[in-house]
Amino acid sequence: MVQDINDFDFSNADISLFSAGSEVSKKFAPTAAEKGSIVIDNTSYFRYEDEIPLIVPEVNPEEIENFKNKNIIANPNCSTIQMVVALKPIHDLYSIQKINVSTYQAVSGTGVNAVSYTHLTLPTNREV
């Protein structure tokens, strides 16, 4: 069943998954958490809040219990998740001290307005 989030009673949801952009999380996730729903947020909105754990279950499951501070769990960026899952066993064996990473993200990830500007950066004399 699909329901309008504006009318949704989060007290009826054990877990609420947010992945509709930071503005939606900003507006509705705190309400869901206050109503007793455990919020798992896949946007960037809560990633840097000290009281909200940033969780990759395969990497730091011991941090999950800290969601009780705000009833919210944040996820890292998708590139970060894949990387840390792969690096965790190496780190456990060899204690990685530093890593430099470059990622290349899709323009569409920043929204439809950014996509309209791709013609400014793409080569015009060859196929893409």
Which residue ranges define each predicted feature?
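N-terminal Rossmann-like NAD(P) cofactor-binding subdomain of oxidoreductases
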Residues: 1-120
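Single conserved hydrophobic/aromatic residue that forms the stacking wall/gate
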Residues: 119-128
